């Protein structure tokens, strides 16, 4: 059977998978689509072999996974698609209630890290469905919105205070942030080397043809082509040394606030040749 590869349905994943989706890279794996939390579950249960998966998922199940080198969905400053909204300064949320989107994993832990480490508070939280619910109507004092919902102001309530968590992390640590890394739960070493080579070629195609692809897929994602082009331009898709240091720092903070037992060692698949 061919490898199965998860594909996050948000537009932020597209540049890495563009060559596979657009047919420029042949012989790729079978693809399964979903939001990050859904793909995390499939990966954990062994129902898919590889996926761009929430970086916190690796930390929670590091014994099961290996990270595919060089690939990330990350930011070096503002990310645009991870927004924290409310009506007061975050430092005033100690006795407040914060709504967390059920579609998220890493972004929720990132917000908890920032609330504790940057703003010095630990408010109550509850889950909400960002596609269907107004969390402020349920009594939230602040709420986190992620993905393509966060990119569409008409889909979330207007609030007085707005923070981009990519920028907040950068300001707090001076490091990039890795929201998702490609993780392998199955597949032989040879299959994973081949997939690594295919993914690098797919990413190269996506970045080289970014503007043209933004025009071609604008209707699919529901954004103007110029907006999509700029959004992809500002994201980071290369897991370099600085991004890896940001990932390690995130894991250390997550352990310090009790979201994971300990910061895991990073285990990698082998690189494909070429």
Whereabouts are the PLM-identified features?
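Short, polar/charged alpha-helical segment
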Residues: 9-34
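A bilobed periplasmic-binding-protein/Venus flytrap-type ligand-binding module shared by bacterial periplasmic
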Residues: 19, 81-91, 177-191
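Secondary-structure end/capping motifs
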Residues: 188-253
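Short helix-initiation/N-cap motifs at beta->coil->alpha
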Residues: 30-41, 121-142
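Pocket-lining segment of extracytoplasmic ligand-binding domains
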Residues: 127-216
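Short loop->beta-strand "edge-of-pocket" segments that line small-molecule binding or catalytic clefts
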Residues: 2-9, 91-107, 196-202
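A conserved helix-loop-strand patch within extracytoplasmic ligand-binding domains
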Residues: 72-132, 169-170
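Beta->alpha turn/N-cap motifs
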Residues: 11-12, 35-36, 46-64, 71, ...
């Amino acid at each position: 059977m061919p490898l199965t590869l998860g594909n996050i349905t948000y537009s932020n994943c597209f540049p890495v998978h563009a060559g596979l989706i657009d047919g420029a890279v042949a012989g790729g794996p079978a693809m399964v689509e979903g939001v990050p939390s859904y793909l995390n579950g499939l990966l954990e249960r062994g129902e898919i072999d590889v996926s761009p998966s929430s970086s916190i998922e690796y930390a929670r199940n590091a014994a099961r996974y290996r990270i595919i080198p060089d690939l990330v969905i990350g930011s070096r400053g503002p990310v645009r698609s991870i927004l924290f909204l409310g009506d007061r300064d975050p430092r005033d949320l100690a006795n407040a209630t914060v709504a967390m989107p059920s579609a998220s994993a890493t972004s929720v832990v990132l917000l908890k890290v920032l609330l504790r480490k940057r703003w010095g508070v630990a408010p109550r939280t509850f889950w909400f469905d960002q596609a269907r619910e107004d969390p402020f109507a349920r009594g939230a004092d602040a709420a986190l919105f992620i993905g393509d919902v966060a990119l569409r102001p008409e889909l979330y309530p207007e609030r007085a205070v707005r923070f981009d968590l990519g920028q907040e992390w950068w300001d707090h640590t001076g490091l990039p942030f890795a929201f998702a890394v490609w993780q392998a739960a199955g597949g032989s070493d040879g299959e994973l080397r081949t997939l690594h080579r295919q993914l690098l070629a797919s990413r190269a195609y996506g970045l080289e043809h970014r503007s043209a692809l933004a025009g071609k897929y604008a209707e699919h994602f529901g954004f103007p082509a110029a907006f999509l082009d700029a959004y992809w331009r500002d994201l980071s898709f290369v897991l370099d040394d600085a991004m890896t240091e940001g990932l390690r720092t995130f894991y250390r903070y997550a352990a310090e606030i009790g979201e994971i037992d300990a910061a895991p060692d990073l285990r990698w698949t082998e690189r494909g040749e070429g």
